[in-house]
């Protein structure tokens, strides 16, 4: 059976390969869920079949999980199977893209409108200094909320007259050192950093859940559909509108592929007047 000892050995090997802590944590959560499922259906890890995978997908669907979430979990299982094959724990691998669920809807992700951004910035002015600075950091870098809340004071530095943020242990190994590209955001974050006490606590002294709570409050107060991740989409879209090359945006966001970056930039407001002939 798939047990805790096998999972821990897999995770340790992935740590030695240099996988980010966030990736290791995701692997752990997903494999523990698989372990519980296999125990329920009394199936050893070395006896997986296509039918097992199909039923696992149905199980996740019944729990209300989205196609992309299930795809990510099967991807983790595929990585685990390849490792288990090398370790001699299984004689063959089963998971393939053929088992990945197909998404039945393609939503166009919108960015915050200019008016909504102004309303949001007014809301930020009512928050405590640390929360205000955290949101401006996300607006000025496009970083994930988890990346912002894990920063330390030493991760923010001044290079010349530009403010840089060193993001470490990021999701999917997307560590990067990036500038705060918005002037006002850079000024607010740096002013906060200059006044904050240097100790072992996170830079903003806030949890991911607390930041998300502020986002929920904003949505409830204004009626604007909002969540923290929308700032990341908005950042990418605004850079696209400014003509920033896609590979540059890919690096700033920490994406592995241009395809993912394109998904984030699709809400850019495109000016077609130069392409539109007059008659």
Residue ranges and their predicted role:
Residues 4-108, 123:
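N-terminal core-binding DNA-recognition domain of tyrosine recombinases/integrases
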Residues 90-92, 103-119, 172-183, 198-202:
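DNA breakage-rejoining catalytic core of tyrosine-based enzymes
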Residues 111, 253-278:
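Catalytic-site neighborhood detector that most strongly recognizes the C-terminal catalytic loop/helix
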Residues 114-145:
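Basic, Lys/Arg- and aromatic-enriched nucleic-acid-binding interface segment
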Residues 138-161, 247:
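Short, charged phosphate-coordinating catalytic segments
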Residues 147-148, 226-227, 236, 243-257, ...:
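Active-site-proximal segment of tyrosine recombinases
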Residues 150-188:
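Conserved tyrosine-mediated DNA breakage-rejoining catalytic core shared by Y-recombinases
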Residues 181-225:
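Active-site/catalytic core of tyrosine-dependent DNA strand-transfer enzymes
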């Amino acid at each position: 059976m798939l047990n805790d000892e096998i999972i821990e050995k897999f995770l340790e090997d992935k740590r030695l390969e240099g996988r980010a802590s966030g990736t290791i944590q995701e692997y752990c959560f997903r494999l523990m869920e698989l372990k519980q499922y296999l125990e329920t259906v009394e199936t050893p890890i070395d006896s997986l079949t296509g039918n097992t995978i199909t039923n696992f997908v149905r199980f996740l669907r019944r729990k209300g999980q989205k196609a992309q979430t299930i795809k990510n979990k099967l991807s983790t299982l595929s990585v685990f199977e390849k490792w288990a094959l090398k370790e001699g724990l299984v004689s063959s691998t089963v998971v393939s893209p053929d088992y990945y669920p197909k998404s039945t809807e393609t939503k166009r992700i919108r960015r915050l409108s200019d008016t909504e951004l102004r309303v949001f910035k007014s809301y930020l002015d009512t928050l405590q200094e640390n929360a205000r600075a955290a949101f401006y950091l996300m607006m000025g870098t496009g970083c994930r909320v988890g990346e912002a809340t894990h920063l330390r004071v030493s991760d923010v530095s001044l290079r010349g007259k530009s403010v840089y943020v060193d993001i470490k242990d990021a999701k999917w190994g997307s560590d990067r050192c990036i500038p705060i590209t918005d002037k006002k955001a850079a000024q607010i974050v740096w002013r906060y950093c200059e006044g904050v006490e240097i100790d072992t606590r996170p830079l903003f002294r806030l949890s991911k859940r607390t930041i998300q709570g502020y986002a929920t409050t904003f949505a409830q107060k204004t009626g604007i559909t909002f969540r923290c991740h929308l700032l990341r989409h908005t950042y990418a879209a605004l850079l696209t509108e400014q003509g920033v090359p896609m590979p540059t945006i890919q690096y700033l966001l920490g994406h592995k592929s241009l395809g993912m970056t394109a998904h984030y930039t699709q809400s850019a407001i495109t000016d077609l007047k130069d392409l539109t002939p007059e008659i």
